[in-house]
């Protein structure tokens, strides 16, 4: 099954013959998945403006125009079910299973650009028929994230808190601050720090970078919205930790690696703008391809990031500027000793990317605006 953002879904056999096609608009960030003989994706009704921006004029659109999950029959392309609770186009939708065997997914509503889906908050959807099991209203919720289950509990971030929600009833069980007096370690110091930080900066409704979160074992990792910091919440104990990281690596042949750190001095550029050199946004043919000035920036702060990926004991955290952090996710303390390596996907300014890393047969696969990349071990 192939899908594009121009309004077409098509299914082909392995010889390339078209089996079926449908004219239907999908969210350009959709993460479709197969469930049995069904193809599940995020369906959208209204398109963005020609400049790629979604205007606020749809904020009061009726339910028929809401963004929804939709399941198609893989054999025919017919609609099997469509949700009614609505979800935000920025959701990273992940199918999961409750302990009673039900296949479910958590979806969220709320965010920037005036999305019409209401109420703001999250819902648990039964993937058997698309029905809503429960909904939890969360006023002011920023839903551009992924939601995972841990022992039948939903783990999510809301404003300055980490919430654990009962996956059976939809009731909030715990609420833990991720911004008030949090232990913070410095990358340059290979030890656990006694420093704490308060991250309540301005009136931000978001406190994590969009779609930067990933639940790995008992740790819920995320990137801060206001600092170049990697954070994690221990969902069993409620412990929160931060590790201050470099903004970007500047690695060049025959020279020692250099790191760019966040400049907080008066008159310094915003976090999202600080780079070794701005991204050129040139593709493999030399054409400049972008519609948002943030694309030239650091990949920290007000952007939608690639979701981290786990392979074995390592968490791979890619940043839009081409830098990739490799973290030992199960480290007892989130400090510099948990950092396995920092590397890049190419030279600074020429390695823009917004995709997660993929893994197969011991190799890492990535792509930037210019290249497809396969990384293998020296032993291979």
Model-inferred region functions:
Residues 1-380:
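Noncatalytic, solvent-exposed loop/strand surfaces
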């Amino acid at each position: 099954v192939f899908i594009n953002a121009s309004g077409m879904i098509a299914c082909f056999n392995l010889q390339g013959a078209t089996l079926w096609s449908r004219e239907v608009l999908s969210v350009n960030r959709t993460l479709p998945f197969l469930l049995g003989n069904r193809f599940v994706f995020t369906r959208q009704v209204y398109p963005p403006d020609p400049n790629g921006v979604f205007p606020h004029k749809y904020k009061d659109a009726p339910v028929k125009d809401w963004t929804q999950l939709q399941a198609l029959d893989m054999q025919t392309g017919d609609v099997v079910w469509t949700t009614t609770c609505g979800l935000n186009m920025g959701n990273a939708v992940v199918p999961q299973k409750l302990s009673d065997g039900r296949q479910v997914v958590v979806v969220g509503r709320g965010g920037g650009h005036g999305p019409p889906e209401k109420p703001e908050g999250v819902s648990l959807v039964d993937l058997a028929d698309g029905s809503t099991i429960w909904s939890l209203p969360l006023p002011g919720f920023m839903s551009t994230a992924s939601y995972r289950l841990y022992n039948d509990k939903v783990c999510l971030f809301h404003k300055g808190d980490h919430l654990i929600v009962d996956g059976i009833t939809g009731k909030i069980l715990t609420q833990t601050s991720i911004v008030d007096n949090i232990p913070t370690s410095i990358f340059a110091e290979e030890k656990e720090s006694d420093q704490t930080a308060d991250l309540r900066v301005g009136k931000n409704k978001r406190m994590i970078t969009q779609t930067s979160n990933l639940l790995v074992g008992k740790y819920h990792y995320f990137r801060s919205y206001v600092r170049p910091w990697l954070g994690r919440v221990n969902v069993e104990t409620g412990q929160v930790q931060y590790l201050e990281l470099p903004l970007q690596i500047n690695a060049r042949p025959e020279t020692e690696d250099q790191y760019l750190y966040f400049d907080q001095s008066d008159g310094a550029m915003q976090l999202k703008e600080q780079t070794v050199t701005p991204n050129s946004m040139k593709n493999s043919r030399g054409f400049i391809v972008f519609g948002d000035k943030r694309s030239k920036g650091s990949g920290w702060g007000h952007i939608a990031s690639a979701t981290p990926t786990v392979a074995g004991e390592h968490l791979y955290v890619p940043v839009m500027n081409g830098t990739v952090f490799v973290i030992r996710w199960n480290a007892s303390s989130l400090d510099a000793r948990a950092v396995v390596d920092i590397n890049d996907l190419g030279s600074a300014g020429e390695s823009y990317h917004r995709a997660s890393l993929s893994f197969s047969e011991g190799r890492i696969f990535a792509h930037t605006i210019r290249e497809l990349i396969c990384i293998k071990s020296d032993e291979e």
